[in-house]
Amino acid sequence: MTEEIHYVKADPSGNTTILVLDAVPKQEHASLAARLLQPECVGAEQVGFLTWPDKEADVRLDMMGGEFCGNASRSAAAYLLSRSGQDHGEYRVSCSGCNKILKAVVVRDEGELYDASIEVPLPRKMDIVSLTDNDITYRFYQIELPGIMHFVHFTPSIKTIDKNA
């Protein structure tokens, strides 16, 4: 039996995200996400589930691991703008791993491209981490957000990034 799932695949800053548009029981999120993430299915790095609350937020995003994700939240807001037919908009986004409503601002760039920004919760913790490889020391910022940890490395130019590493 084939199950039909409506979804949008977004690519916010290279962080490919599947946003499931249908109501899916929470206990089925993990198994559905595992299927959708497979390259032979849709393929992406992560899955979020959208719901439409009737309260303070315009959209609710529940990530497959219960974490907060700024890129997926921006994508949810961009999806709302795409449905509105407008060229710009402000949206209130609720996301797992975050206990406040976040304001997102989205502008249609061209076609199906969007420029979206969103408030992010304050980190629980931030540290500086240094790693040395081939006598070169790299400095990273370790940023702990609710449900997820990021390592951020600033580079003088995107051209200096080894995309095959």
Give each language-model segment a name.
Residues I118-I161:
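Surface-exposed beta-loop interaction hotspot
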